[in-house]
Each structure stands twice: as C-alpha cells, then as structure tokens.
Amino acid sequence: MSRKPFIAGNWKMNKNPEEAKAFVEAVASKLPSSDLVEAGIAAPAVDLTAVLAAAKGSNLKVAAQNCYFENSGAFTGETSPQVLKEIGTDYVVIGHSERRDYFHETDEDINKKAKAIFANGMLPIICCGESLETYEAGKAAEFVGAQVSAALAGLTAEQVASTVIAYEPIWAIGTGKSASQDDAQKMCKVVRDVVAADFGQEVADKVRVQYGGSVKPENVASYMACPDVDGALVGGASLEAESFLALLDFVK
C-alpha cells in the first residue's frame, strides 16, 4: 500500500519565536502539495505558539519535541499534552535519543507518553535507535525491536497504524556519519516487522517509518527510494528554510 512520505524537521533547542516565525513564513507558501508529501516542524515549546500562528492555513504540520504523560498537576517544568492539543499541535516527538540519554527517559515513560498523546487526539513520532557499540556488536535489530515493542505496548491496532516511528541510529545523529541506504532499509524493515509481529501485517503496512541521522538535501532521495523508508526526521538540515524546502524536492 502507498504510505504518504513524511519529512519532519527537528529544530532541537534552537530558534527564538521571532526566528521561528520568520522560518515558517519563508516556507509555508512553498511547500509541495500535501497529496504528495507531509511536511512538519518539531519546534521547542517556547516557539510553538509562534510556529502554529505562522503555519495557520498552510500544509505545514507542527510537532512538539516532548510532553509529559499527565495532563496537569504538580509536575514543574513539564509540558501538558492536553494544552499542546488545545493550542493546535499535530504531533509530539517522543523517545529521542537525546531525551533517553540526557534525561534518562525509559521505554516505560515513552509508552505512557504515547498513550497520553493519543488520549489527547494527537499523533506520536516515536524515536528508536542504537548506539555505535550495539551496532558494531551486531545487536541493532534486537535492541531497536525491543524499543519499538515496549513503546507500542497496550496501544490499539488503530492507534499503532497512525503512529510514526523514526529510526535514528545514535551514531549517525549530528555526527556527519549517515547510515548507508542498505542499513537504513534493513533497520526500517526491522521496525515494520516488529509491528507486524505485535499487531499484524495490515497494521505494519500502514505505519510510517522515518529514517533520521545526518539526512541532508543531497542524500534524502536515496533514503526515500528504500521500500520501508517513508520519510525522514531531520535535525541540522531543517534549520534553514532553503535547506528544509530542498529536503522536500525528492517528490518532484
């Protein structure tokens, strides 16, 4: 079945609201048709209202970079999924390796967040990926498979079918090293096979699997040519409007 490609830029902790607004204004009217490709930006929490206002009426989807699994309460410094939905957020990125690494997020946390995101009417972009050590030990498939299974545990088949899963080998994030086309295809297929084993092939055929890790305008088309790669989660190359638009050129 055909899955609509999804290119999402992850700005990480970059841009103030003014810069974010200028970026969205520069790209909003130049995006390809939403029939061809979905384009999104994951903005820092402090930029979300500016991004949402600037993106209004355009094809640009807006994602938060994280949220908590409770809607409100004594959770100082956390972001409410309920409020993210209320302001108009479409997606929430969860389980990014930087969150797992620096903030000690567990598979269980990520699973709770996925459930909270669905409960509030948004969609999760669930990140998974292995370290260089795990990759070199030949255990990438086993490790990533366990991450995916744990993140999706207890979700309905319908929820899983609309989930986006981003495979990002940690050794390729921001390092300038990117996985080969073969590696990306192999691991994105591992992700899909795990979904098939847990929820059935029909669901697995609907899940969109992104590749992330040093994706640039020059190499995005080669990844998008892989049968199991349905998009990309892009860091550095999504920070400039021109570069972000160039990432979407593969649809031409």
Swiss-Prot record:
It is found in: Cytoplasm. One of its GO terms (biological process) is gluconeogenesis. Its main location: cytoplasm. Keywords: Cytoplasm, Gluconeogenesis, Glycolysis, Isomerase. It comes from the Bacteria. CDD domains: TIM. Substrate binds at residues 10-12, 174, 214, 235-236. GO terms for cellular component: cytosol. Pathway: Carbohydrate biosynthesis; gluconeogenesis; Carbohydrate degradation; glycolysis; D-glyceraldehyde 3-phosphate from glycerone phosphate: step 1/1. The active site is at 96 (electrophile), 168 (proton acceptor). Its EC number is 5.3.1.1. It catalyses: D-glyceraldehyde 3-phosphate = dihydroxyacetone phosphate. GO terms for molecular function: triose-phosphate isomerase activity. Belongs to the triosephosphate isomerase family. PANTHER family: TRIOSEPHOSPHATE ISOMERASE. Homodimer. Involved in the gluconeogenesis. Catalyzes stereospecifically the conversion of dihydroxyacetone phosphate (DHAP) to D-glyceraldehyde-3-phosphate (G3P). NCBIfam families: tim. This is Triosephosphate isomerase. It comes from Streptococcus gordonii (strain Challis / ATCC 35105 / BCRC 15272 / CH1 / DL1 / V288).
